[in-house]
Amino acid sequence: MASELDGLPVIATRREEAEGFLQGLVSKSLGWARKYSLFTYPFVTACCGMEYMTMASARYDSDRFGAAMPRFSPRQADLLMVVGTVNCKQAPILQRVYEQMADPKWVMAFGVCASSGGFYDNYATVQGIDRVIPVDVYVPGCPPRPEQVLDGIMLLQKKIQNQSHKLIDRTPLPVISGGAGR
């Protein structure tokens, strides 16, 4: 494995190649594990909530896609499902919920109202939640069918699996001796 650094060839050692291989393997394993363990937090505001409940029922079984039970706190979730219309008074609340989620986090806009404001084109409605928070997957429909939502979850799973998952550096910090005890 050779690369260029200021015009001079740099040859990686076998150890560096092995570390790169292991990091890639661990990153792929993390992607595989994360894609099947989505902890959802629903932000339900409108009529699409009925289809959200249908999608979570036994007939469609969202558990087999790794998006089982909704969490009761955004701190426990990594997938925010914005279901329905968001008005201007709710936008700061939605922003706060998004900020409370732990990294990595993903957002799904559930329905036309969450994606683009729907047919509510007035001063009080946010014309798409992407004006407030970043969105990873848009699920169209008024309301979207449960099959469409499951397709959106599978699309998000592919995106999660293909992302690079950084490892946390756990090198110990140096111990500073001295102080009051000396």
From Swiss-Prot:
What chemistry does it catalyse, as a reaction equation? a quinone + NADH + 5 H(+)(in) = a quinol + NAD(+) + 4 H(+)(out)
Principal location: membrane
Q: Can you cite a GO biological process for this protein?
A: electron transport coupled proton transport
Which UniProt key words apply to this protein?
Answer: 4Fe-4S, Cell inner membrane, Cell membrane, Iron, Iron-sulfur, Membrane, Metal-binding, NAD, Quinone, Translocase, Transport, Ubiquinone
The keyword tRNA-binding is annotated on this UniProt entry: no
Look up the record and name the cofactor or cofactors this protein needs.
Answer: [4Fe-4S] cluster
UniProt GO molecular function: 4 iron, 4 sulfur cluster binding; iron ion binding; NADH dehydrogenase (ubiquinone) activity; NADH:ubiquinone reductase (non-electrogenic) activity; quinone binding
| Cofactor remark | Binds 1 [4Fe-4S] cluster.
Q: Name one Pfam family in it.
A: Oxidored_q6
Recorded E.C. number(s)?
7.1.1.-
Topological relation to the membrane, as annotated:
Peripheral membrane protein
Q: Where does [4Fe-4S] cluster bind?
A: C47, C48, C113, C142
- Report one GO cellular component: respiratory chain complex I
Q: Which family does it belong to?
A: Belongs to the complex I 20 kDa subunit family.
Q: Which NCBIfam families match?
A: nuoB_fam, PRK06411.1, PRK14817.1
What is the recorded function of this protein according to its Swiss-Prot or TrEMBL entry?
NDH-1 shuttles electrons from NADH, via FMN and iron-sulfur (Fe-S) centers, to quinones in the respiratory chain. The immediate electron acceptor for the enzyme in this species is believed to be ubiquinone. Couples the redox reaction to proton translocation (for every two electrons transferred, four hydrogen ions are translocated across the cytoplasmic membrane), and thus conserves the redox energy in a proton gradient.
Write the protein's name: NADH-quinone oxidoreductase subunit B
The organism encoding this protein is: Anaeromyxobacter dehalogenans (strain 2CP-1 / ATCC BAA-258)
Gene name on record? nuoB
